[in-house]
Amino acid sequence: MILVWGNSLQGQEVSRGRLGILLGGMNGVSYDYALTDHLEVGGTAAFVLGLGYGGSSKSFQFDGLTPLLELAPRYYFSRREEGQSFNKGGYLSLRLGAQIDDWRLFPSKAGQESNVKSHYTLGMAPTFGWSFPLSSKSYLRLGIGLLFYRAKKSHAGDSYYAGQSYWVTTQRLSDAPFLLDIGYGIAL
């Protein structure tokens, strides 16, 4: 009985891990591992494109590329088909990330001249999205979520508070910024 069960498992074994390249809102490398036909865990090392809409300035803002490490379990509503490289369809995800704001590339002029410096940010974002396979080796992923964060900041310049650091966190649900995820992935 055990030998038959063991042989049937070996016959069904498919590659569950996938190394890839991400382009879009996050630009870097990812590794996704399918735990089941519905559940996968993804890890990402990337540069995040700092785009946003300023509520007070009523304008779009660019704030450079920030290094990010992210872990994101995703539950797909549709079942992963045999031989398919990517899950497709709707998913729920809990994205956990850490970004190092001090290492930002191409920071905005406003960010460089600001008296408040951001050092690093820890975030959690429940996300709903949709994944579209474009070919056997690529996909397009679109998602939206709410970002809950905790950021380490400090005062700079010649002010009385210069050098003092403090934490900024999401205080209320209404303060949580929307997280838009638009990404193109290619399996290696």
Per-segment meaning from a language model:
Residues 51-63, 98-121, 151-173:
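Flexible, solvent-exposed loop segments that connect beta-strands
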Residues 2-10:
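C-terminal segment of classical bacterial N-terminal signal peptides
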Residues 9-16, 38, 78-90, 134-138:
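Short loop/turn motifs that connect adjacent beta-strands in outer-membrane beta-barrel proteins
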Residues 58-99:
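Mid-chain, structured segments of secreted extracytoplasmic proteins
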Residues 9-60, 64-65, 101-103, 181-188:
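Short glycine/proline- and aromatic-enriched beta-strand/turn motifs that initiate or cap beta-hairpins
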Residues 15-17, 23-25, 63-69, 118-124, ...:
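Residues that define the transmembrane beta-barrel architecture of outer-membrane proteins
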Residues 17-23, 43-45, 71, 92-96, ...:
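Membrane-embedded beta-strand positions of outer-membrane beta-barrel proteins
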Residues 67-78, 174-188:
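Outer-membrane beta-barrel "beta-signal"
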